[in-house]
Swiss-Prot record:
Protein's recorded name: Variant surface glycoprotein ILTAT 1.24
Subcellular location: Cell membrane
Species of the source: Trypanosoma brucei brucei
Disulfide cross-links: C37-C162, C143-C204
Basic and acidic residues compositional bias, start-end: 465-476
Length: 514
């Protein structure tokens, strides 16, 4: 009887041990795996975020480029105006923004690729770890606990974000949920240690400890240093029945020791991807953009350069910076809005590819192709204008040369013998002449007495006056016929002709500058 009681007691102890062991078969708590599935879904947005970021920079570049071309279009039509100088100065400042944005785009593509690679790796690791727990079921028992710990959580896995990747044909531009991915880390992935990650008991044998060496015992020999690592460190068991989760909430603070892990690198690459662009902010108007440009050093430097180029001075000669800013941009950029209104309402030619002479308002031109055609049109118009001016100058020079060659003075100067000179009705021989003068010179008095007209050409008339002015002292050299210059009394009409020719040439040169 005693033996039977002892045997029954032994059996009860064994059954109790089995029940206790079975009761310790903990799965993974819903609050542990659900945020990781949510993070998986957010990380998979990275390709769309990268597309949005690169497109945003490209659109900013395009917006600035169109603004630049509109400013240059007005300046091309009125190249010598004060407005044109101002617009070219704004364009110079805008070019600095374009260069910075171009560099940002080049770097942005690299950031986009890196962020997408790291985020994809992290999302894949999270999904595969939780999928392993999902598949550890026989239809009755399970390793993923549902919310509330009372049932199987497998059915909720997909709805929480853990499902096979399926990209659309066209990536959707997206943005992150900042409750899941913040500027510091992954806020919902806070640490769960010891027994904090245990799900429903008696359901999952995955984290069962081996009672001895793994070679001869089932389970994991945690006492020997073995551990279970799911999702590249997202779920880790270093002790029996204790699935844990690392701290990934703040990589600059509490999760600093995780910064060099896959998840830390994924977050760092995402942060770099989200850096602000250099271009205009969404919704920024042309006037706002131009006012910001007017404040840049490059705009003021351009004004000084253009003024120096048109006057022959050096840029360092222009020192009154505030006065220059006020003159061209207005006090606190007050001239900018009126300038832009004038630009956008101006009608220009060249936008129509079929009819270049057709006019269009600058505000209606919103493609690079249209604006480039306008710039080409005015480039051709300027070229033709310069060619016509060069032709007119050459013609004028020829006419002046012809007039000088046919003047009475020139005809007399050709005679080198005194008898022949004296025989001419309009010439007289001068024995004593100054250096560079001819002996045979025109004599208007003799020509008049001989009945020869002395107003044959403009130059001839001037030479008649030259005879009157010749030899006079400074006191007697008076206008309108004579003018004292270079120590001698000269015909003022000849000086006027020379000044006229010089002014024409100067005007042509100024036109070439712009």
């Amino acid at each position: 009887m005693v033996y039977r009681n002892i045997l029954q007691l032994s059996v009860l102890k064994v059954l109790l041990i089995v029940l206790i062991v079975e009761a310790t078969h903990f799965g993974v708590k819903y609050e542990l795996w659900q945020p990781e599935c949510e993070l998986t879904a957010e990380l998979r947005k990275t390709a769309g975020v990268a597309k949005m970021k690169v497109n945003s920079d490209l659109n900013s570049f395009k917006t600035l480029e169109l603004t630049k071309m509109k400013l240059l279009t007005f300046a091309a039509k009125f190249p010598e105006s004060k407005e044109a100088l101002t617009l070219r100065a704004l364009e110079a400042a805008l070019n600095t923004d374009l260069r910075a944005l171009r560099d940002n785009i080049a770097n942005g593509i690299d950031r986009a690729v890196r962020a997408t690679a790291y985020a994809s790796e992290a999302a894949g690791a999270l999904f595969s770890g939780i999928q392993t727990l999902h598949d550890a079921t026989d239809g009755t028992t399970y390793c993923l606990s549902a919310s509330g710990q009372g049932s199987n959580g497998n059915a909720a896995m997909a709805s929480q974000g853990c499902k096979p990747l399926a990209l659309p044909e066209l990536l959707t531009e997206d943005s992150y949920n900042t409750d899941v991915i913040s500027d510091k880390g992954f806020p919902k992935i806070s640490p769960l240690t010891n027994a904090q990650g245990q799900g429903k008991s008696g359901e999952c044998g995955l984290f069962q400890a081996a009672s001895g060496a793994q070679a001869t015992n089932t389970g994991v020999q945690f006492s020997g240093g073995s551990r279970i690592n799911l999702g590249l460190g997202a779920i880790v068991a270093s002790a029996a029945q204790q699935p844990t989760r690392p701290d990934l909430s703040d990589f600059s603070g509490t999760a600093r020791n995780q910064a060099d892990t896959l998840y830390g690198k994924a977050h760092a690459s995402i942060t770099e991807l989200l850096q602000l662009a250099q271009g205009p902010k969404p919704g920024q108007t042309e006037v706002e953009t131009m006012k910001l440009l007017a404040q840049k050093t490059a705009a003021l430097d351009s004004i000084k350069f253009q003024l120096a180029a048109s006057t022959g001075k050096k840029t360092s000669d222009y020192k009154e910076d505030e006065n220059l800013k006020t003159e061209y941009f207005g006090k606190t950029e007050s001239n900018i809005e009126a300038l832009w209104n004038k630009v956008k309402e101006e009608k220009v030619k060249g936008a129509d590819p079929e009819d270049p002479s057709k006019e269009s308002k600058i505000s209606d031109l919103n493609t690079e192709e249209q604006l480039q055609r306008v710039l080409d049109y005015y480039a051709v118009a300027t070229m033709l204008k310069l060619a016509k001016q060069a032709e007119d100058i050459a013609k004028l020079e020829t006419e002046i040369a012809d007039q000088r060659g046919k003047s009475p003075e020139a005809e007399c100067n050709k005679i080198t013998e005194e008898p022949k000179c004296s025989e001419e009705k309009i010439c007289s021989w001068h024995k004593e002449v100054k250096a560079g003068e001819k002996n045979c010179q025109f004599n208007s008095t003799k020509a008049s007495k001989s009945g020869v007209p002395v107003t044959q050409t403009q130059t001839a008339g001037a030479d008649t006056t030259a005879e009157k002015c010749k030899g006079k002292g400074e006191k007697d050299c008076k206008s309108p016929d004579c003018k004292w210059e270079g120590g001698t009394c000269k015909d003022s009409s000849i000086l006027a002709n020379k000044q006229f020719a010089l002014s024409v040439a100067s005007a042509a040169f100024v036109a070439l500058l712009f």
